C-alpha cells in the first residue's frame, strides 16, 4: 500500500491518498481543500472512494468537487450527517474555500467495517468524541492509523464543537491505546505525524483525560 499525505488549505488538513500499487486503485481521505492539487495526484489512478474521517467542513470541503470529477462514492459515518451543512462559524466556508454544502454519504461507515483496495484493506474504527461519527482507518499490514482529529502530536481533538463529548473522546482514546501497538504510525488530521508509542509517553492531554 502506497500512502501520500498532502497538507491542504489554511488549516493544513492532512489529506491522505492511499493506493494499491498492483491494481492502481486509490482512496482519498479528508479532501478538505486544494481540489486541483488533489485531482492531479489522483489522475494516474482509479479513484474508488472518497472518505471523510468526520464531517467538519475543513475535512469535507472538496468532497463535492471530487465526486463530480471522478464519480466516486463518498464514505462517512451517518452520525456526522448533521455537520455537512454546518460551517461551524458564519462565513467559515468562504474563508477556507469550501464547495459547500457537502453531499450526504453514499456509503455509511460502521465500526469494524473493512474497506478493500485491491489486495489491501483498511479497517474502520468508530472513535466518537471530537464528533459523534469520527472514524479512524487502520491498515494492519502497514501498521498505519489515519486518525482524523482524534489524536495529534502532543494533543487530542477538541470536544467543545457541536456533537463533541469529552467522555466519548476519553473512551475512544482508551480504545485506540489499548488495541494498537506502540510502533503504529499515526497520520493526524492536521500537522505532523506521530506514533502510538510517542503519544503514550509524552502526550500531556492523555494523562489528564485518563485521570
Where are these regions (language model features)?
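Short Gly/Pro-enriched turn/cap motifs at secondary-structure boundaries
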Residues: 6-8, 104-106, 126-128
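Conserved S/T- and glycine-rich ATP-binding loop of Class I adenylate-forming
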Residues: 18, 53, 127
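Short, glycine/acidic-enriched loop or turn micro-motifs at the edges of active sites
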Residues: 22-23, 33, 57, 80, ...
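Metallo-beta-lactamase
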Residues: 92, 121-210
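Active-site HxH/HxHxD metal-binding segment of metal-dependent hydrolases
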Residues: 33-116, 120, 201-205, 209
Amino acid at each position: 500500500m502506497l500512502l501520500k499525505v498532502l497538507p491542504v488549505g489554511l488549516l493544513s488538513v492532512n489529506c491522505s491518498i492511499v493506493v494499491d500499487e498492483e491494481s492502481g486503485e486509490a482512496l482519498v481521505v479528508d479532501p478538505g481543500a486544494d481540489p486541483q492539487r488533489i485531482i492531479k495526484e489522483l489522475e494516474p489512478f482509479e479513484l474508488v472512494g472518497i472518505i471523510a474521517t468526520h464531517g467538519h467542513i475543513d475535512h469535507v470541503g472538496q468532497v463535492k468537487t471530487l465526486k463530480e470529477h471522478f464519480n466516486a462514492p463518498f464514505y462517512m459515518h451517518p452520525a456526522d450527517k448533521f455537520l455537512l451543512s454546518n460551517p461551524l462559524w458564519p462565513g467559515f466556508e468562504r474563508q477556507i474555500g469550501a464547495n459547500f454544502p457537502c453531499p450526504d454519504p453514499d456509503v455509511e461507515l460502521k465500526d469494524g467495517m473493512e474497506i478493500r483496495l485491491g489486495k489491501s484493506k483498511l479497517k474502520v474504527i468508530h472513535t466518537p468524541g471530537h464528533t459523534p461519527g469520527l472514524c479512524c482507518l487502520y491498515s494492519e499490514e502497514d501498521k498505519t492509523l489515519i486518525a482524523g482529529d482524534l489524536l495529534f502530536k502532543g494533543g487530542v481533538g477538541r470536544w467543545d464543537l457541536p456533537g463533541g463529548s469529552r467522555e466519548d473522546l476519553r473512551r475512544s482514546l482508551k480504545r485506540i491505546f489499548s488495541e494498537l501497538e506502540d510502533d503504529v504510525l499515526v497520520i493526524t488530521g492536521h500537522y505532523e505525524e506521530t506514533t502510538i508509542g510517542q503519544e503514550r509517553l509524552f502526550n500531556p492531554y492523555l494523562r489528564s483525560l485518563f485521570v
